[in-house]
């Protein structure tokens, strides 16, 4: 069967593209390697969402705001709240399980079709244009045709395998941003954590200029514990090449995402290197416990 639009990747970028195309009258197929939608936000513990605002002005709206509104309506997000570290203007905590359900519903309402547990295997090009892709799933290898193909793989796999010129890493040495394996902690005493930070602002110098904002903002997000981190590294209990703990509340009571591991000098587009990075990520997560 041929679709008007075939989208490789069911993360939020792929999902919003799918919804927009289907609402415009196109037949849409989303090819997703996991058993659920949401990409890094649901599969990798990435959160909160960021960059909806630049200062006071909201710069991301449309379908993404629809998703946030739907999450809020079901109690799965507090919506946009101030970033107490002020890296960005606002952050948007959310429930990953809730986002999976919202995306399922939105794509079905729009008339999109989804193939879960399906991997892109080959890109078939004719006269300089993609004519079809070969995918692999429980049915084996089979070909999917489309009028338009959208690369929402996250790594540009569709574009790269079609022969497009790709740029990866810094021009001078090819180095890319370190990889991270997030870990989620539950049962955290938020009031005790917040009280400690407010009682020792000198130990959380990145928060210090915004301590009043931190005092009134929920859920809690912070960066700190530099001294404890340094001591653990000196004692050989941590092998992580960063300086502190970075953590974000998800909005669920006592639940936090620690964005603190750091896997350097590995390549997420190389199968062997990526496999080693997975091992190192789990090792670093265990060190944090």
Description of each model-found segment:
Residues 4, 25-27, 147:
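Residues that mark the start of a beta-strand
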Residues 14:
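N-terminal Rossmann-fold NAD(P) dinucleotide-binding loop
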Residues 8-10, 31-34, 152-153, 260-261:
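Active-site-proximal beta-strand/loop segments in catalytic clefts of secreted hydrolases
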Residues 124-143:
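Conserved beta-strand-loop-beta-strand element in the redox core of flavoprotein oxidoreductases
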Residues 137, 141-148, 152-289:
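Flavin (FAD/FMN)-binding glycine-rich loop and adjacent Rossmann-like elements that form
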Residues 6-8, 17-18, 22, 128:
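Membrane-embedded transmembrane-helix bundle of lipid-linked glycan/lipid transferases
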Residues 1-11:
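Beta1/beta-strand and adjacent pyrophosphate-binding region of the FAD-binding site
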Residues 20, 26-27, 32-126, 177-178:
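Conserved N-terminal/central alpha/beta ligand/cofactor-binding core
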């Amino acid at each position: 069967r041929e679709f008007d639009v075939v989208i490789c990747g069911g993360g939020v970028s792929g999902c919003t593209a799918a919804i927009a195309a289907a609402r415009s009258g196109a037949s849409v197929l989303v090819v997703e390697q996991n058993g659920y939608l949401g990409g890094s936000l649901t599969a990798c513990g990435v959160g909160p969402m960021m960059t909806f605002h630049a200062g006071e002005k909201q710069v991301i709206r449309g379908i993404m705001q629809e998703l946030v509104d739907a999450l809020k309506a079901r109690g799965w997000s507090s919506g946009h709240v101030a970033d107490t570290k002020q890296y960005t203007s606002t952050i948007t905590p959310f429930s990953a399980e809730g986002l999976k359900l919202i995306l399922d519903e939105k794509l079905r309402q729009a008339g999109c079709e989804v193939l879960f547990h399906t991997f892109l295997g080959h890109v078939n090009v004719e006269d300089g244009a993609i004519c079809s892709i070969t995918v692999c799933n429980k049915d084996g290898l089979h070909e999917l045709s489309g009028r338009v193909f959208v690369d929402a793989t996250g790594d540009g796999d569709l574009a790269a395998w079609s022969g497009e010129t790709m740029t990866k890493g810094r021009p001078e040495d090819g180095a890319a941003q370190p990889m991270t394996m997030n870990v989620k902690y539950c049962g955290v005493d938020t009031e005790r954590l917040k009280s400690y930070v407010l009682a020792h602002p000198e130990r959380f110098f990145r928060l210090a200029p915004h301590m009043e904002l931190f005092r009134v903002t929920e859920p809690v997000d912070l960066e700190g514990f530099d001294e404890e981190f340094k001591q653990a590294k000196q004692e050989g209990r941590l092998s992580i090449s960063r300086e502190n703990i970075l953590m974000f509340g998800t909005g669920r009571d006592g639940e936090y995402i620690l964005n603190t591991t750091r896997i350097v000098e590995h390549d997420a587009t190389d199968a062997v290197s990526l496999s080693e990075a997975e091992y190192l990520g789990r090792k670093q997560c265990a060190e944090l416990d």
